[in-house]
């Protein structure tokens, strides 16, 4: 029973999130200490910006010129390094604590080409939670995405049904138009034929009349 309440407490508690930023120069190394329990998942996201004199503000640098080096060390085990990752100026990383204790997370801006002593701004956000909780969150996200995909598929089916209905209406309208045009054409031909017959008949009648009158 007690374990059930503990599980509920873990589920209901939000993830611990901490976000901050600091200023420095290219090549500076900044470290943070985190006390983590066993099977705790630490997720970090970072964004490195470099001061641009033309913009008079900080902006994302070229991936060819700058990068980030990420190290995670176990302080309780003589600073044994368990993570060494090199990334782009903007990205994320994750780490699963295999043992309970204090961990040191270090980020160092890396300058690939010599561009002088440039001022930098590093934004970092840590998210700490149990792996099962994060898996649950990912599952909920996938279910939400699946629901959105189902809605989109339903809308696509409705659109296709409307398109099919429009095609059927267009075909019906085209058949009616062709039928009307065909009838109009035959009615015109009939009228012309009748006019020709009437003209011929009138010509014969006039000719017969003039013959009787001895005009022709």
Swiss-Prot record:
Localisation per UniProt entry: Endoplasmic reticulum membrane
SMART domains listed in its UniProt record: EMP24_GP25L (SM01190)
Signal peptide residues on this chain, from the entry's feature table: 1-19
GO cellular component entries: COPII-coated ER to Golgi transport vesicle; endoplasmic reticulum; endoplasmic reticulum membrane; endoplasmic reticulum-Golgi intermediate compartment; Golgi apparatus; membrane; mitochondrion
Cytoplasmic side: 205-216
InterPro entries listed in its UniProt record: Emp24-like (IPR015720), GOLD_dom (IPR009038)
Domain GOLD: residue ranges: 29-130
Annotated protein name in UniProt: Protein ERP6
Organism: Saccharomyces cerevisiae (strain ATCC 204508 / S288c) (Baker's yeast)
């Amino acid at each position: 029973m007690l374990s059930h309440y503990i599980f509920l407490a873990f589920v209901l508690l939000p993830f611990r999130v901490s976000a901050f930023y600091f200023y420095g120069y290219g090549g500076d190394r900044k470290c943070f200490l985190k006390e983590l329990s066993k099977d705790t998942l630490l997720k970090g996201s970072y964004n490195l910006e470099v001061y641009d004199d033309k913009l008079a503000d900080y902006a994302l640098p070229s991936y060819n010129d700058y990068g980030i080096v990420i190290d995670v060390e176990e302080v309780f085990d003589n600073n044994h390094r368990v993570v060494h990752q090199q990334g782009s100026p903007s990205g994320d990383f994750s780490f699963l604590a295999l043992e309970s204790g204090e961990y040191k997370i270090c980020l160092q801006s890396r300058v690939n080409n010599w561009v002088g002593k440039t001022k930098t701004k590093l934004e970092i956000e840590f998210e700490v939670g149990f792996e099962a909780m994060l898996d649950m969150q990912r599952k909920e996200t996938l279910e939400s995405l699946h629901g959105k995909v189902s809605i989109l598929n339903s809308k696509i089916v409705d659109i296709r049904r409307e398109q099919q209905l429009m095609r059927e209406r267009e075909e019906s309208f085209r058949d009616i138009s062709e039928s009307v045009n065909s009838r109009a054409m035959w009615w015109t031909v009939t009228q012309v034929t009748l006019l020709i017959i009437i003209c011929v008949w009138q010509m014969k009648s006039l000719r017969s009349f003039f013959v009787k009158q001895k005009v022709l």
